[in-house]
Amino acid sequence: MLKDITLGQYFPGDSAIHRMDPRMKLILTIVYIVGVFMVSNLPGYLLALAFLYLVVRISGIKFSYLVKGVKPLRFIILFTFVLNLFFVQGETPIFSLGFFTLTKEALHNAIFFALHLVFLVMGTSVLTLTTSPVQLTDGLERLMHPLQRFHFPAHELAMMMTIALRFIPTLLEETDKIQKAQMARGADFESGNLLARAKAMIPLLVPLFVSAFRRANDLAMAMEARCYRGGDHRTRLRELRYTRLDVFGALATAAFIAVVMLEGRLLG
């Protein structure tokens, strides 16, 4: 299950999405997510899904691979779904069972909030799958560069965010290895209820933390050995430049937002 998480992984390729400027991809990803959160009905979500499917097809990534990345988060999505059912108040009851009354508004909010999380994960996964770590760091740094005049550490923050993001699949892979090693020694992670499974995962934490600190130390030593001193006077092999692909991407995303807003007014 852990190996199915796509967030933080990079899928090498030469598609139009891969060749886009990382700054533009970051901006358009944020705009897409904002557009998804503007959606409040089923046709809008179908439109968001169709747009995402088109982008994934252009990138050369299998859409099923992206869907698999949502599966490990199903418990979080289910938890938020149930939370909305219990705590969102409504005026149109569907049925009552003891102290619990399910309303149409609560069900509506639960479904749409769960869909928001799904699109949030899938949208950001497309960004990391089509953008290398170096490009992602450069893109974040260039976007935050104007803040440096206020002594904002743009390069350091961009580096920290990128390393943290790229460590997600590494730590998940390490967790999977430790889990398999402990299962070979008789550990049981699959039987019992949800609470019992959660308790069984506790022995994974100590070796996982040790591995994480070891990897972080190795990375720090490697950066120091290469005389890394931050972003001051840093040169780049390829300078970032906007191209026609970025213009087409911006126009397509703007069209998506316009259609979402128009559809919301017509059906809202």
Write out the residue ranges for each language-model feature:
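Transmembrane alpha-helix interface motif
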Residues: M1-L42, A48-R57, R142-H145, R149-F152, ...
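Membrane-helix interfacial "entry" motifs
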Residues: D14, F37, G60-Y65, L97, ...
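Alpha-helical transmembrane segments and their helix-start/interface "positive-inside/aromatic belt" motifs
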Residues: K25-L26, S64-R74, D246-G249
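Transmembrane helix-loop junctions in multipass membrane proteins, especially transporters and channels
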Residues: N41, Y45, G60-S64, V88-S96, ...
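Alpha-helical transmembrane segments and their membrane-interface exit regions
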Residues: F51-I61, F75-F79
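Juxtamembrane/interface alpha-helical elements of multi-pass membrane proteins
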Residues: L73-A187
